[in-house]
Amino acid sequence: MALLQQEKQQIIESYRLHDTDTGSAEVQVALLTSRINQLSQHLQRNPKDFNSRRGLLMMIGRRKRLLNYIAKHSPDRFRELAERLNIRVKK
C-alpha cells in the first residue's frame, strides 16, 4: 500500500525547490496526495475497511494543514501547487 521507493523519489524530484530538498511543505503535500490517491482506490475496492478510512482522513487533514501553511506564506506557490496536483481549493 505504501509508495515504492522509485515512485517516492520521482515525486520528490519533480516537486523539490532545490537540489537537496526532500522535506519542504510542497514535497510533503505531493507525497501525501499520492498516498491519498492510492488509499482512495483501495477504499473503493474495500468499502468496509474502516481503519484505512481513518488513516485517509488523517492524511487529508495533514495535507490541508500543510496547504494552509503554504497559502499563508506564499500564495503564488500555493496556487501553482494546487493546479499541478489537481487539488480543489476554496476561493
From Swiss-Prot:
GO terms, molecular function: rRNA binding; structural constituent of ribosome
Subunit structure: Part of the 30S ribosomal subunit. Forms a bridge to the 50S subunit in the 70S ribosome, contacting the 23S rRNA.
Function: One of the primary rRNA binding proteins, it binds directly to 16S rRNA where it helps nucleate assembly of the platform of the 30S subunit by binding and bridging several RNA helices of the 16S rRNA. Forms an intersubunit bridge (bridge B4) with the 23S rRNA of the 50S subunit in the ribosome.
One Pfam entry name: Ribosomal_S15
Lineage of source species: Bacteria, Bacillati, Cyanobacteriota, Cyanophyceae, Synechococcales
Any Gene Ontology CC annotation: cytosolic small ribosomal subunit
NCBIfam families tied to this protein: S15_bact
Family matches, as Gene3D superfamilies: 6.10.250.3130, S15/NS1, RNA-binding
Gene: rpsO
Protein name: Small ribosomal subunit protein uS15
Highest taxon, organism lineage: Bacteria
Keyword Transmembrane helix recorded: no
Presence of the UniProt keyword Nucleus in the record: no
Alphabetical keyword list: Ribonucleoprotein, Ribosomal protein, RNA-binding, rRNA-binding
